[in-house]
Curated annotation (Swiss-Prot):
InterPro entries: BIR_rpt (IPR001370), BIRC2-3-like_UBA (IPR048875), IAP (IPR050784), XIAP/BIRC8_UBA (IPR042579), Znf_RING (IPR001841), Znf_RING/FYVE/PHD (IPR013083). This is Baculoviral IAP repeat-containing protein 8. A zinc finger (RING-type) spans 189-224. It comes from Pan troglodytes (Chimpanzee). The lineage of its organism: Eukaryota, Metazoa, Chordata, Craniata, Vertebrata. Its main location: cytoplasm. PANTHER family: BACULOVIRAL IAP REPEAT-CONTAINING PROTEIN 8, INHIBITOR OF APOPTOSIS. Binds to caspase-9.
Amino acid sequence: MTGYEARLITFGTWMYFVNKEQLARAGFYAIGQEDKVQCFHCGGGLANWKPKEDPWEQHAKWYPGCKYLLEEKGHEYINNIHLTRSLEGALVQTTKKTPSLTKRINDTIFPNPMLQEAIRMGFDFKDVKKIMEERIQTSGSNYKTLEVLVADLVSAQKDTTENESNQTSLQREISPEEPLRRLQDEKLCKICMDRHIAVVFIPCGHLVTCKQCAEAVDRCPMCSAVIDFKQRVFMS
C-alpha cells in the first residue's frame, strides 16, 4: 500500500463524504468496513467522516508521529494543526493563563522533537502536552532529555491509576502494615518477584518488570500486547 494508485484502488465505489483521492494522497486506504480507513505507514485508523473534513488535517490531529505524514507535510504543518486546536479549546475554557503566556508555552512545546518522539512511543498527545506545560510553568523551561520526559509520563500515569485504586481501597479496612507491603510489592518485578521494576513497555505503558526480565519478553506480561519499544526508567 506504499503507492498512491494501490491505495486508491481499495476505495472502489466509495460513496462517503470525503474524496477518495484526498484520502489516498494522505496515506489512507479503505479496509472494507463502512467508511473506515487506515494509514499504510503508521497503521492509524479513522472512521465516521464528516463533510468537508480534510484527510491530512485528521491524520495530523490523531497520528502526528506518522513518518509518512512528517515527510509529506513537515513538522510545521503538524504543529500548526495542534496549535489551532489548542487555541480553539482555550476560547471555550476558563483559564488563568494570559494569551501571551499560552502562546509562549505553545511556542516552546510544539517545535520540540521530543513531543513527536513521545507520541511515536505511544503516549497520548494531550498527556505529553499537559506534562510539558506543567514543566515550563514550574521550572521555566521544557524537558532537556527524552528519558526524563518518559519517566514523568509513566509516573503521572501510575499516579492516576493509584488514585483510582485508592478511591476503592478507602471503602474497606486495611491493616497498618498493608500499605507498606503493597508499596513493596508494586516495586517488584512481576516475573522474578526479586528485582525492582525498571522498564516501561511501549505502546501499552505497563511498568512491570526488571531490566533483566524485560530483555527476555516480546509481549507485555500484564496485557499480552506486542512490545514495540522498551524504555528504561529509574524508580525513586
